[in-house]
Amino acid sequence: IAPETNQVAGTVKSTQGIYKGIIYWNSQQRQSQEKMNQINIFLNKIKKLYAFKGKNGNHTFGLIPLVSPNDDPADAQINVLYPVENITINMPNIGSVCVSRAQFEELTIIPISELNLLSYDDFPSPQAIKGEVVTRSGQTFAGNLAYDLDESYEFEVLDGKNNTISYRIPFRYIRSIAPKNYKYSFITLRNNSQLSLG
């Protein structure tokens, strides 16, 4: 599966939520035509990719090619199985999410114009992470921060997982981090989204 030109945008539905952004297959973007069960299909001709369980209980995937106004909807569906280990969604102003095969439900291809893509001006000079740390005893310390000993600039990323869904979030998009327990923390983003990551 591959785009003919440029990047491909989509909305991914998983067992834990819906994500919208630039789509990558199996941790890499496809940019050339690829054979699939002896059928050549460009990604920009695909409308949906959906997951279902095969006879052996494993997740497999089917494709529904894009329907043009002159097509007969009855002929629109082609059941082509395609192995997908994961789908990564690069979301502007949030970060990237990697959805595993087990938690993937559906991908819908959308026009890239529906995304608010970042421009060169959205990437200023690197800034140190600044903030406040509140201890369990109530003490507050303010200044430059180094998260996990080595992340000290806003362009560096916080890596976390929830089940088998992986997140990579630049610190510039994070508002606060609060411990939930010894395994997970609550992450609040600047757009007010909240995540529980371990």
Q: Where are the language model's segments positioned?
A:
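Compositionally biased alpha-helical segments
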Residues: 1-198
